[in-house]
């Protein structure tokens, strides 16, 4: 009888990618099939994220809901992976002794043998080491599930921003060999993928054997069948003139960039150890917009970082106006255990943080909607991905400006194809269009 695998994923696109590779790995090595129902699973995996507040509590709360399943089925294997697993290690079992396997982002390739060992020896298996880039050599070819795919090109981060746990949970930066990345994308393209998103915690810091991220972008663009290239997440320090020129030269690169700045106050940026000023950030954006005038920019913002004053927040709002950010992942600051910022006095009242966050997000939402309204009446090329989630009589796809477009059509053969649509209306979170081709 085929064994069943259930995976719950918290957090970023890197975690989504890692979870998809776990499915590939366990499907190949243990013939497991994915299920959406944890009650019928033989193996349950929780892929965790530790970026935001109360991440650990969220993990243990979820594990508690699965405890009864373990009691009913002692053969069930429960595993915890991701960044909380890296932080907590074997200590996870202090609060959840029914967990069988604990693994980090860099050791997910060892899951088959860890699961087997947990079953046969009835002893917990813990491996949260950082074995460089070994996991990519041990993973099977990725499954193709639709016209878009994620491709991890590097792992970890060496920037050590004072608020961030990534260097401690995913290790320092390690890039995959260029040939390996390209081989994976060729495989995807040969199996119908038309759009790839290159992933890394500091993706534009990619470097391997004399090749940098701009070289990688040009090489990916040369692969037959790849019509669109996205990438995330970038660091302003690594956003070089060569990358800007690549945006001007490579038609497959979308006109949308996620380049987190976190704050607009130089004093706060220094306290965060971002190693650039607001002016330096704006200078990079100006050069990019000179090369690609209609590109849209999104960011991350942390509101209420220790010591943030009203003046600091005003400077952040000025940066938002100056750049015209289209979208943001914005959060109230919360200390992450083990980071340098956790030792700073968190002296901004919670209510003030929430007020600032609301003001910031409202303005960015306004700017994003204004950008959407400017698209009304234009023709946009979209990659059709699926039926609309709200109306089965409509298809949907995404523009190169990262807008979801829903349009009336019931022809499933268009899924996976590029089509032109006329934009008829702008809604708060999507566009409405009419098929032209």
Swiss-Prot record:
Q: From the UniProt record, which GO molecular function terms apply? A: 4 iron, 4 sulfur cluster binding; metal ion binding; N6-isopentenyladenosine methylthiotransferase activity
Q: Which cofactor does it need?
A: [4Fe-4S] cluster
Q: Which UniProt keywords apply?
A: 4Fe-4S, Cytoplasm, Iron, Iron-sulfur, Metal-binding, S-adenosyl-L-methionine, Transferase, tRNA processing
* Locations listed in the record: Cytoplasm
Which residues are involved in binding [4Fe-4S] cluster 1? Answer: 12, 49, 83
Which Gene3D superfamilies does the UniProt entry name for this protein?
Methylthiotransferase, N-terminal domain, tm_1862 like domain
- Which purpose does this protein serve, as stated in its record? Catalyzes the methylthiolation of N6-(dimethylallyl)adenosine (i(6)A), leading to the formation of 2-methylthio-N6-(dimethylallyl)adenosine (ms(2)i(6)A) at position 37 in tRNAs that read codons beginning with uridine.
**Name this polypeptide is given:** tRNA-2-methylthio-N(6)-dimethylallyladenosine synthase
Which organism encodes this protein? Stutzerimonas stutzeri (strain A1501) (Pseudomonas stutzeri)
Task: Output the lineage of the source organism.
Answer: Bacteria, Pseudomonadati, Pseudomonadota, Gammaproteobacteria, Pseudomonadales
State which gene encodes it: miaB
């Amino acid at each position: 009888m085929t064994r069943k695998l259930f995976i719950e994923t918290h957090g970023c696109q890197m975690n989504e990618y890692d979870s998809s590779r776990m499915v590939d790995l366990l499907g190949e090595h243990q013939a497991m099939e994915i299920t959406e129902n944890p009650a019928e699973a033989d193996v349950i995996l929780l892929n965790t994220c530790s970026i935001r507040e109360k991440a650990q509590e969220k993990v243990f709360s979820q594990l508690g809901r699965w405890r009864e399943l373990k009691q009913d089925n002692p053969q069930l294997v429960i595993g915890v992976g991701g960044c909380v697993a890296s932080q907590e290690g074997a200590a996870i079992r202090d609060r959840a002794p029914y967990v069988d396997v604990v693994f980090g982002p860099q050791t997910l390739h060892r899951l088959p043998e860890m699961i087997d060992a947990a079953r046969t020896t009835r002893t917990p298996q813990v491996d949260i080491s950082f074995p460089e880039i070994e996991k990519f050599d041990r993973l099977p070819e990725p499954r193709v599930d639709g016209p878009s795919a994620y491709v991890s090109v590097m792992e970890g981060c060496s920037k050590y921003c004072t608020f961030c746990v990534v260097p401690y949970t995913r290790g320092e930066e390690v890039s995959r060999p260029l040939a390996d990345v390209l081989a994976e994308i060729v495989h995807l393209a040969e199996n119908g993928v038309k759009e790839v998103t290159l992933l890394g915690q500091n993706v534009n810091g990619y470097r391997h054997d004399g090749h940098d991220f701009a070289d990688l972008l040009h090489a990916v663009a040369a692969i037959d069948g790849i019509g669109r290239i996205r990438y995330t997440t970038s660091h302003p320090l690594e956003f070089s003139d060569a990358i800007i020129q690549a945006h001007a030269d490579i038609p497959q690169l979308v006109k949308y960039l996620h380049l987190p700045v976190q704050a607009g106050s130089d004093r706060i940026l220094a306290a965060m150890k971002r190693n650039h000023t607001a002016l330096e950030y704006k200078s990079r954006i100006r050069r990019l917009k000179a090369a690609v005038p209609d590109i849209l920019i999104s960011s991350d913002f942390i509101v209420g970082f220790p010591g943030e004053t009203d003046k600091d927040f005003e400077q952040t709002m000025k940066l938002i106006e100056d750049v015209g950010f289209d979208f943001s992942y914005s959060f109230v600051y919360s200390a992450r255990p083990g980071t340098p910022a956790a030792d700073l006095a968190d002296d901004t009242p919670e209510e003030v943080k929430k007020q600032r966050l609301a003001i910031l997000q409202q303005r960015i939402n306004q700017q994003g909607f204004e950008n959407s309204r400017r698209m009304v009446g234009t023709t946009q090329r979209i990659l059709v991905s699926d039926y609309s989630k709200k109306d089965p009589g409509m298809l949907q796809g995404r523009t190169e400006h990262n807008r979801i477009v829903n349009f009336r059509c019931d022809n499933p053969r268009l899924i996976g194809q590029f089509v032109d649509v006329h934009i008829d209306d702008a809604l708060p979170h999507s566009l409405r269009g009419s098929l032209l081709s």
